[in-house]
C-alpha cells in the first residue's frame, strides 16, 4: 500500500478553501485529522510553527508543496505518520533567505516516532513530489476518493 492510500486509510486528510488563512493556521489545520486519528497531540502544530519561525519557510518546496514537520521524536508525535491537506488558495509562508516567495497549497504533514518508517515515508513522498501530474491532481483534490483516484491514475515508482 502506498503512502497516499495509507493517508486515506488512517483518515489523515483534509481539504480547505484557504481564503485568508495564515501559514500558522494552515499548519494547525493540517494536523487536525492527525489529532483525531491519534497520530499527534493537540499541541503538536505549535512545535512545527516554532521551527518554521526559527528556521524560515524550509518546509516549502517546489510545486507549492509544504511538508510541515518538527525534529524527530518531538513531544506530541504519538505515531509515525503523514497527513495530507489540499487548499484551494495558496498559503503564503513569506520569503526565504534569498527573498524568494514561498507559497503552498498541498501539505504533507509529518510525524515521526520510528526513524525507519519515517525514512520510508520521506522516500515515498519524494517520489510523489517528482510526479507533476500527481501533484496537480492532489492540489485539485476535494475528497478522499480524489486522492485515491490520483494515486491510481498517476502511479509513482516504488
Over which residues does each language-model region extend?
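Cytosolic covalent-transfer regions centered on His/Cys nucleophiles
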Residues: 1-158
Amino acid at each position: 500500500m502506498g503512502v497516499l492510500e495509507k493517508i486515506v486509510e488512517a483518515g489523515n486528510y483534509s481539504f480547505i478553501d484557504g481564503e485568508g488563512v495564515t501559514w500558522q493556521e494552515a499548519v494547525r489545520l493540517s494536523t487536525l485529522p492527525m489529532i483525531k486519528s491519534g497520530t499527534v497531540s493537540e499541541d503538536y502544530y505549535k512545535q512545527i510553527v516554532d521551527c518554521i519561525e526559527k528556521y524560515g519557510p524550509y518546509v516549502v518546496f517546489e510545486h507549492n508543496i509544504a511538508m510541515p514537520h518538527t525534529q524527530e521524536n518531538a513531544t506530541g508525535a504519538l505515531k509515525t505518520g503523514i497527513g495530507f491537506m489540499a487548499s484551494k488558495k495558496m498559503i503564503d509562508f513569506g520569503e526565504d533567505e534569498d527573498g524568494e516567495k514561498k507559497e503552498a497549497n498541498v501539505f504533507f504533514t509529518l510525524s515521526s516516532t520510528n526513524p525507519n518508517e519515517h525514512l520510508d515515508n520521506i522516500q515515498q513522498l519524494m517520489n510523489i513530489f517528482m510526479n507533476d501530474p500527481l501533484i496537480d491532481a492532489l492540489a485539485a483534490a476535494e475528497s478522499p476518493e480524489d486522492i485515491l483516484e490520483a494515486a491510481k491514475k498517476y502511479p509513482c515508482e516504488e
